[in-house]
Amino acid sequence: MSDAPYPVLVVAPLVIHGHEVEAVLFDAGGIFVIPDPHVVSPLLQYYGAVADLDRYHRAHYAGMAAKSAAGSGERDWSEYNRAYVESVGVPSHDCEEAATVLDRTRNAYIWRHPLAESVAALRALHEMQVPIGVVSNATGQIESVLARSGVCQVGDGPGVPVRIVVDSHVVGVAKPDPLIFDYGLAVLAGIDRARVAYVGDSVTMDVHGSRAAGLLPILLDPYDDHDGADFLRIRSLLDLLPPSTPPHR
């Protein structure tokens, strides 16, 4: 985890809900990619789910809210699965079987459907010269998936250039263990970790983990599933940008 050869840039800090931020690290799943609805939808339609792909976007966050409410760890997706299939309209009498099908289908490699709005926000941050990177619980695939999906890559490429993509499988430590964030912070030399935001979609993994690491946790909560929470929430990654920033579509 040696310091990367990046210059210390003097960039006006972002101000997010009153907090000055000099760099931003992100989760990957639920932030830039979600389980591909083109894969999941046909499987769940067999059990009565709707075909509207937008509902599968909402279903992911319903699932994550249920998972967080249960305090489930990284390996327990049972609450996520049930909330997901309910959200896409599977009748109650078929939810158990549909949730089992989802569980056996939702592998690491179908977390590949890019969220265009999030990618646009990431590009805007890059163009503002805000140091950015990714820290994700994954299985060794996330750097390739993000690049192949046109989201981001380290250095030049078709996606947004980022400083680092940390994969928990590769580094051998996973959220909510705060040590994983040290790998991302290693390329942010000269920046106080208290002025580094971490944006994720899980209270248990992302908010608790990054808070323990001394970062500023921010939850992406597009459907306001966590009203009254004691941490910062945004409905879109575009909310990270100054109001005068033009959209990047």
Task: Locate each region found by the language model.
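N-terminal helical cap/lid subdomain that shapes the substrate entry/recognition surface
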Residues: 3-128, 140, 144
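Asp-based, Mg2+/Mn2+-dependent phosphohydrolase catalytic module
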Residues: 1-26, 93-95, 119, 123, ...
